[in-house]
Amino acid sequence: MSEPLKPRIDFAEPLKEEPTSVFKAQQTFSEAESRTFAPAAIDERPEDEGVAEAAVDAALRPKRSLWRKMVMGGLALFGASVVGQGVQWTMNAWQTQDWVALGGCAAGALIVGAGVGSVVTEWRRLWRLRQRAHERDEARELLHSHSVGKGRAFCEKLAQQAGIDQSHPALQRWYAAIHETQNDREIVGLYAHLVQPVLDAQARREISRFAAESTLMIAVSPLALVDMAFIAWRNLRLINRIATLYGIELGYYSRLRLFRLVLLNIAFAGASELVREVGMDWMSQDLAARLSTRAAQGIGAGLLTARLGIKAMELCRPLPWIDNDKPRLGDFRRQLIGQLKETLQKSKSSPEK
């Protein structure tokens, strides 16, 4: 038997035709135009943080100027002249048996040698600080690389610089997790998740401790000058501690350079984050109304110390931040507020007893 016919279906609107793609006319570029050709930008609105970091890199990139080369050449020529004159004086004093002049030449040679040694030491420490930025760039390249052979040696070098012993549990877990079939990206990624957090946790504890000390000191101290000196001293100590944790030995000039890098990084890249994480929370909770003026100033000083520590941590780390593992200012803010409230409650309850 044949199946019955289905009833007719009437549509209210006619069928829509599929849209046809419209192609633009062919355009041919000349050789002169192809040299100045630039592709159109797909995303014209980059993130503020990326723009700020690019501005920081451009501002901190060393610039070789003619005046600097002339000054360095003059200093080198002056140093060579001093050494040559010292050798001539020593030879004349030896020939004439002028022992007093010979002793003066020996003392001058010791002073010059000590000065040269200190300059070489400072230069080596400054070079080590600059080398950390190159290591961070190399790690960023390895994290996007699919090659094999460089990742393990690079991570072992980082562990040696940080003073992590071969018998450390975190390093042993990393050795157990890697194998020959993994590429550099996977090996460096495992190091970033298994070994690097050990140093990051120590740096976070140092930042929390120094920020809490700054907050409490400002909150209870009545002298503004003492507060300023204390905060400056503690911030420098914090930067030194973080640099030591990550295996960087700071000298005088390298310490100044790192402090300058931290301040410039805050000035360029920290304003938006500081307003976003601090200002809105303060307005919502109205902390200024519930805490005293000194307590509010103490929280501000503690947040500044924490911000310095976070940026010093970022500049001293040999690896870039991965998977949003960068410490946030809000975490330290909540901790500082809790510690300050606890201290104020204890101070109020002690006179009642």
From Swiss-Prot:
Its main location: membrane. The chain crosses the membrane at residues 70-90, 100-120, 213-233. GO terms for cellular component: plasma membrane. It is a multi-pass membrane protein. The keyword Kinase does not apply. It is found in: Cell inner membrane. Keywords: Cell inner membrane, Cell membrane, Membrane, Transmembrane, Transmembrane helix. PANTHER family: UPF0283 MEMBRANE PROTEIN YCJF. Belongs to the UPF0283 family. This is UPF0283 membrane protein YcjF. It comes from Salmonella schwarzengrund (strain CVM19633).
